A protein has these predicted regions:
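A short helix->loop->beta-strand "cap" motif at the edges of active sites that frequently abuts
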Residues: 23, 50-51, 74, 120-123, ...
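N-terminal pre-core extensions flanking Radical SAM catalytic domains
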Residues: 1, 207-209
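Conserved alpha-helical substructure of the radical SAM core
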Residues: 1-54, 62-68
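Acidic (Asp/Glu)-rich catalytic clusters
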Residues: 19-20, 69-74, 119-120, 144-148
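Radical SAM enzyme [4Fe-4S]-AdoMet core and its adjacent flexible, acidic
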Residues: 87-207
Length: 210
């Protein structure tokens, strides 16, 4: 489903409206927010209004130059990482189109480079992982320990009416499988209290996101 692209000015008006209604934090997500031509301006506008700003991205177009430019305006950097290996990422379709056509992905190397540089600049770091039938048996604990994010959000693959109904059934995991994945990683990372692990099952997500 295609929606009209929001203009620069309309986006700033929306940000101002939510800020004036008492919202103090704003998170830019997608799709892939880094593909939007007005994203940088909107983040800067939100920060100038005093809001806490964050983004969730797969790392597209996230250059060192952009990270340096945005450091005064962007508080939290979130990266979508679903697996501990790029073999799994290739199966899940997380990678650049050319890579995926060859049956490969270099997503982890790109994320590692972004995270290393972003942490030097002092960004807050979040990881987002969607648990599906492809990665439900994966162990991400070593990878998460190596990156030491401030927060790791773990989501259950969510069916969305009119968006992914035709594709999601083969990827869905049961509530029990999701809980097992979450508890397993909480236990393995129990010695790292500085990593906040937050799990959101389907019920939680339906009640959280508009």
């Amino acid at each position: 489903q295609q929606f009209p692209r929001i203009t620069l000015d309309d986006g700033i008006k929306i940000i101002l409206s939510v800020q004036q209604s008492g919202v103090s934090k704003i998170n830019f997500v997608g799709g892939e927010p880094m593909l939007h031509p007005h994203l940088t301006a909107w983040i800067k506008a939100a920060k100038r209004l005093g809001m806490t700003t964050s983004i969730v991205s797969n790392g597209t177009n996230m250059t060192e130059e952009w990270l340096v430019e945005m450091r005064p305006y962007l508080d939290w950097l979130g990266l979508s990482v679903d697996a501990s290996t790029d073999e799994l990422h290739a199966v899940m379709g997380r990678g650049r189109q050319g890579e995926l056509r060859r049956g490969e992905s270099h997503h982890l190397a790109r994320c590692d480079s972004i995270i290393t540089f972003a942490k030097k600049l002092g960004y807050g770091l979040k990881l987002n992982t969607v648990v599906s039938s492809v990665n439900v048996a994966d162990d991400m604990s070593s990878l998460v320990r190596s990156w030491m994010p401030d927060r790791w959000k773990i989501f259950q693959a969510l069916p969305i009416a009119g968006e992914n109904d035709s594709d999601i059934e083969a990827l869905e995991v049961s509530d029990a499988e999701f809980t097992s994945y979450l508890n397993r990683h909480v236990a393995k990372l129990s010695g790292y209290p500085e990593i906040e692990i937050v799990g959101e099952d389907n019920d939680a997500m339906r009640g959280t996101y508009a």
